[in-house]
Curated annotation (Swiss-Prot):
PROSITE patterns: INTEIN_C_TER (PS50818), INTEIN_N_TER (PS50817), RECA_1 (PS00321), RECA_3 (PS50163). NCBIfam families: intein_Cterm, intein_Nterm. It is found in: Cytoplasm. InterPro entries: DNA_recomb/repair_RecA, DNA_recomb/repair_RecA_CS, Hint_dom_C, Hint_dom_N, Hint_dom_sf, Homing_endonucl, INTEIN, Intein_C. It comes from Mycolicibacterium chitae. Keywords: ATP-binding, Autocatalytic cleavage, Cytoplasm, DNA damage, DNA recombination, DNA repair, DNA-binding, Nucleotide-binding, Protein splicing, SOS response. This is Protein RecA.
Amino acid sequence: REKIGVMFGCFNYSTRVQLADGTTEKIGKIVNNKMDVEVLSYDPVADQVVPRKVVNWFNNGPAEQFLQFTVEKSGGNGRSQFAATPNHLIRTPAGWSEAGDLIAGDRVMASEPHRLSDQQFQVVLGSLMGDGNLSPNRRDRNGVRFRMGHGAKQGDYLQWKTDLLANIAHSAHENAKGARFVDFTPLPELAELQRAVYLGDGKKFLSEEYLKALTPLALAIWYMDDGGFTVRSKGLQQRTEGGSGRIEICVEAMSVGSRDRLRDYLRDTHGLDVRLRHAGAAGKAMLVFTTAASAKFQEIVAPYMAPSMEYKLLPRFRGQGTVAPQFVEPTERLVPARILDIHVKPHTRSMNRFDIEVEGNHNYFVDGVMVHNSPETTTGGKALKFYASVRIDVRRIETLKDGTDAVGNRTRAKIVKNKVSPP
């Protein structure tokens, strides 16, 4: 006896497929007209969204039902929408998952434009350690809003940072005290960073991976934002030639564990002798550098300092700033996007199921969401008389914390298939 081949799920006629030229087309029209088009597809080797040819077209007849998905996205009306059969495979951060196994609140992988250059990402990393912040988009859109703010005396410095991000849409405003703020358009590429840094306890959480990603530019921005420099000697005597001083940087906004990790990172990676102390009546956490470590740190960051902030450098390190804006063209990259709603789509005039086969990568995008090139059919072969198939769906419900440290996850397990029968 032969096993029958299995064909996976399909889409409703109106589901829009993203074409390589940036437009979209209904999958039903692509199939019915056997349109010779290129679609966007994810290449896992290159980690890029690339154009790929459609090489086969499928109209698989009527479906019993379609599940209508609504997923957050950054552009347009803030919604991605498509209708799939429950067995269609959709990409999630954990791998492929059947549409029927997903619930609202789960995340799927979507293609979103990435606008930040490597240099600009470092500006964000450094600012987050200092006076910058990331706030989630409260309108159920994908992407988070980056904000920088400084007092009236630091207007030139804020403008210097804004110029480094000038190609990102932004708005500026001033409060009654003269402090200035710059808000940038929500960026989907920063959503994961926001989730990693803000764990809900009001303090910023900096992981080992965050610290390893820092370049001297990010360290310079952190220092310019929150650092203070006290001159100990102006270098008038021969033994103090070049001057000396001591850096202190406020780390009160960081979690206790993050302060320790940052201190250890500066010691181990840059060989800087730094220690933590609590200053003043308020007991604010400060990172204190020795005079030798202060000079060494200033040597590292000097080429990345803003002209208006050179007073925080010893005279011998001034005038070295060489930072110029580096912009890049937007590229499509994968980011997690939250499912806002799933419901059974009401019956329509056409309940036919449509699918396409894509050259090479076997995936494509429907209204931005990555889905499997499903008419991969299993080839069949000799069947077992009986077989068992059990699948357990394990989901993370919440993160368990000990103080500020994540120590585990609370999970929910559900048997989603349990079958013992002749095929």
